Amino acid sequence: MAHSQVGIQLISESTEKTLAELIALCAEHNIIHNEKSPLALVQTDDRLELRKLDEPKLGAVYVDFVGGTMAHRRKFGGGRGEAVAKAVGIKGSALPTVIDATAGLGRDAFVLAAIGCQVRLVERHPVVFLLLQDGLNRAYQDEEIGEMLQQNLHLLNVQHINELDPNSDYADVVYLDPMYPHKQKSALVKKEMRVFQHLVGADLDADELLLPALQLAKKRVVVKRPDYAEFLCGKQPHFSHETKNHRFDIYMGASQC
């Protein structure tokens, strides 16, 4: 199943990786150079990053599991007490296997992997897939967390969970966090998310995720939603966990959409 073609500026600022190498990598994922795009995928010496060239103050979007907010969250966050950990059913020694079907920048998946869950990632947008792949490859080399991530966090080479076979590719939990339109002028829309949303947009076909998720999940499907969003597929969950700005809708076992 090929990605639909994405046009974006491709730029190399790296002394080691050439523009030709970046173009070749992107071509494998149906990403082509479009010099008129306000978005750019940039290869630096350190990482692959996404920039919105007409709004440089927004900064670059990239995946970093080793430093920054993820390091702080791993060392000082709530761990098993985090809302996402409770939502997927981590309790005592129970560590469910998880498919994160809307991986994005991998943050919730990283939290679960750091606790000890085996997490498989699926990402539908090819640019985000490459950012995630780049971040994982760098993190796998890290002395402190590389071995743990190689064991617990893997990016699957599929675009949609409907490509997975429920008879062999199942997991205890399927986690869904589809992009949802933010309220107009919301102060909560971070700079990084504005760049991300310009690339990805709202997940208009998010409802199509629920049925294959229910078929793959042995124990539960967890759907993260803004507190003002309707239920995915219009389907009432068995129960919900509410946080300050979000809720986790939980569908148990063999529910059907």
From Swiss-Prot:
Cellular component GO terms held in the UniProt record: cytoplasm
Residues involved in S-adenosyl-L-methionine binding: 107-108, 123-124, 177
Catalysed conversion reaction: guanosine(1516) in 16S rRNA + S-adenosyl-L-methionine = N(2)-methylguanosine(1516) in 16S rRNA + S-adenosyl-L-homocysteine + H(+)
InterPro entries: 16SrRNA_methylTrfase_J, SAM-dependent_MTases_sf
Keyword NAD part of the UniProt annotation: no
Assigned keywords, A-Z: Cytoplasm, Methyltransferase, rRNA processing, S-adenosyl-L-methionine, Transferase
Pfam families found in the cross-reference section: SAM_MT
EC primary class: transferase
Chief location: cytoplasm
Entry superkingdom: Bacteria
EC nos: 2.1.1.242
Location(s) in or outside the cell: Cytoplasm
One GO BP annotation of this record: rRNA base methylation
GO molecular function: 16S rRNA (guanine(1516)-N(2))-methyltransferase activity
Family as reported in the entry's similarity comment: Belongs to the methyltransferase superfamily. RsmJ family.
Role noted for this protein: Specifically methylates the guanosine in position 1516 of 16S rRNA.
Protein name: Ribosomal RNA small subunit methyltransferase J
Organism: Haemophilus influenzae (strain ATCC 51907 / DSM 11121 / KW20 / Rd)
